[in-house]
Amino acid sequence: MFKVENQSELVTAQKDFMDVVYPVVEHFYTIQGEGAHTGRASYFIRTAGCDVNCWWCDVKESWEEEGHPKMTVRELVKEAVESKAPFVVITGGEPLLHDLLPLTLGLKSAGLQVHIETSGSSPLSGQLDWITLSPKRFKKPTEEVFAYVDELKVVVLTNKDLKWAEENAAKCPEGTKLLLQPEWETPKSIDLIVEYVKENPEWGISLQTHKFLKVP
């Protein structure tokens, strides 16, 4: 778990954190399709804005903040609670471009667990129960993020990405869930990953099962 330092002072500084707004691309109740929590019911909040801009990204509309509606913490918490999801996944875009303290406090005060999917390119913020780090070679994660990583999920296209995966795994805490994920439009990466995992069984495979299931 990651908790921001001096939390009480920061909360006091926010007159009413429930009224803080975030640019939101979409929010929805679905099944987590990737990673360690695949198959679990979850509520997704996709923030707008990204400084990584992966060419294979399937939500390029999330890159720019402009043009997306602003939603308050109060509104987002209400939607998440009404869905009856056991946990919320904050994703993007790159969600850590925003101060997540108000949003995560609101969600946790409602009894929800908070997960995040991030490239780690910006400093951690907020209260986070599960951190999935998906690092990119062209926008490296901050060093501070590694101490808090619960799950390392690396998108693989070529052998270079396998080397990159190992470099990042070496910085993660013992017990971190290690996953390799094929890039959806690069099927040849599947054979590469399968053989690598057979030879290195500390790694597992993450698939984008939501695309097979045809759910958001």
Task: Enumerate the language-model features and the residues they cover.
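A short, compositionally biased domain-edge/stem linker segment
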Residues: N6-A13, Y29-I31
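Short, charged low-complexity linear segments at domain edges
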Residues: D16-A41
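Flexible, active-site-adjacent loop/turn segments at secondary-structure boundaries
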Residues: E26-Y29, E34-G35, E61, E144, ...
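Conserved AdoMet/S-adenosylmethionine-binding subsite of the radical SAM
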Residues: V77, L96-P216
